Swiss-Prot record:
GO terms classed as biological process: signal transduction
Binding site for Mn(2+) 2: D85, D290, D334
Keywords for the protein's UniProt record, in alphabetical order: Hydrolase, Magnesium, Manganese, Metal-binding, Protein phosphatase
Single GO molecular function: metal ion binding
Textual note on the cofactor: Binds 2 magnesium or manganese ions per subunit.
Family of the protein in this entry: Belongs to the PP2C family.
Disulfide bridge partners, by residue number: none
Domain PPM-type phosphatase per the UniProt entry, residue ranges: 47-343
Protein known as: Probable protein phosphatase 2C 65
Ligand binding (Mn(2+) 1): D85, G86
Species the sequence originates in: Oryza sativa subsp. japonica
Superkingdom per UniProt: Eukaryota
CDD domains linked to this entry: PP2Cc (cd00143)
Length: 399
């Protein structure tokens, strides 16, 4: 969910609808593997990025960015996975800037000549502290960069760093990270980040203390009581952050990188960081943009990942289901970026045998067709692009 100058600010019930769907298939996802020798783990990871469908802007550039940096900073036990969701007129540039800046700044925190000439890397000794310094530094660099106009544009950032036997997640904004944890015979969702939006009472109070108004678009327009704080998440008209005497910035989040004009009303780049010990019960984790979580809960996503042995299949299943739900509720889809990381060791690998099904060849082909259709209608002069995508969904073979 973006800002008033970026992603849609029209309440959801006033928007159009699309049609049906199916899940499954690899759909262009990429696969990689890397060892974590200090913890005896192997990470098997997949990434998938699909640009959103905006009928009024065919060929629109995706504003998401992501990175995978294995053996981060030259350390065999450090592996970084991050997603950035840009917003505003320069959202793509902001997301790309953050993607490029974060690894450099994170690796550089605390580096200097030691007593014996060696460098001290905080990211190795205290990853959470390194994140708390690097993300605000990326924000400051973005403000100063001539090539990026972040006055009314910016990006979220959610980054997961595997550091030996621990997982450290830093979040700024409303992208999300979640782990799948084996508990009592099932895979449960463990939140690794918390969406920073005005729905949260603590974040709402913080920005109000900085002089912000917190209202939905309909409250600003006088359709609803401006004093009411009874927003419903699935209504599609979320509370937003506004200047006291202006119709800006209109952000549906309370923290971000960039958004220089919003800083005066409390939209900050300070991350929240969660650190967890990786146990044999931790089967995988997911890092994704809010294009995934707009209509899917964290448990929904975890259930879908758990149903597929190949993380590429899971990426495409989640993307296809997310697109289906977007088209059922709106006349567009958001950009979607997903990183899935399986955590393998000798103790937890057998737990993957509980999976509900193996995707059929038909479902694999279906998801690939969905992704390819979405990409093709974005760039082709189709009279009804949403209808074209819906036809692909409706032709999907049943498992």
């Amino acid at each position: 969910m973006g800002c008033a100058q970026g992603k849609c600010c029209v309440p959801r019930r006033q928007r159009g609808r699309g049609g049906g769907g199916a899940v499954g298939g690899r759909g262009g996802a990429t696969l990689g593997r890397v060892a974590v020798p200090g913890a005896g783990l192997v990470l098997e990871y997949a990434t998938l990025a699909v640009a959103g469908l905006y009928p009024d802007s065919p060929g629109r550039e995706s504003q998401d960015a992501h990175l995978v940096a294995t053996r981060f900073a030259g350390h065999p036990d450090l592996h970084l996975f991050a997603v950035f969701d840009g917003h505003g007129a320069c959202g793509a540039a902001c997301a790309g800037f953050a993607r490029d800046a974060l690894p450099r700044l994170l690796a550089g925190v605390g580096v200097g000549a030691g007593e014996e000439g060696g460098g001290r890397m905080v990211v190795v000794e205290d990853p959470a502290a390194a994140f708390r310094e690097a993300l605000p530094a990326a924000n400051a660099e973005m403000h100063a960069a001539d090539e990026v106009d972040d006055s009314m544009s910016g990006t979220t950032a959610v980054a997961a760093l595997v550091a030996g036997g621990a997982l450290h997640v830093a979040n700024v904004g409303d992208s999300r990270a979640v782990a799948g944890v084996w508990r009592e015979g099932r895979v449960a969702a463990e939140e690794l980040s918390w969406d920073q939006t005005p729905f949260r009472a603590d974040e709402r109070a913080r920005v109000k203390a900085c002089g912000a108004r917190v209202m939905s678009v309909e409250q600003v327009e006088g359709v609803r009581d401006p004093e009411a704080e009874s927003w419903v998440a699935d209504e599609g008209d979320p509370p937003r952050v506004w200047a006291r005497d202006g119709l800006y910035p209109g952000t549906a989040f309370t923290r971000s990188l960039g958004d220089q004009a919003a800083e005066a009303v409390g939209v900050i780049a300070e991350p929240e960081v969660k650190s967890v010990e990786i146990t044999p019960a931790h089967l995988f984790f997911v890092v994704a943009s809010d294009g995934v979580f707009e209509f899917l809960s964290s448990q929904d996503v975890v259930d879908m990942v758990a149903a597929y042995e190949d993380p590429r299949e899971a990426c495409s299943a989640i993307a296809a289901e997310s697109y289906k739900l977007w088209l059922e509720h709106e006349n567009r889809t958001d950009d979607i970026t997903i990183i899935i990381v399986h955590i393998r060791d000798s103790e937890n690998v057998d737990k993957f045998l509980y999976r509900k099904r193996i995707p059929s060849a038909g479902s694999c082909c279906c998801a690939m067709a969905v992704v390819l259709a979405l990409q093709s209608v974005r760039h082709a002069p189709v009279a009804n692009p949403l209808g074209a995508v819906a036809r692909v969904f409706l032709r999907a073979p049943a498992d």
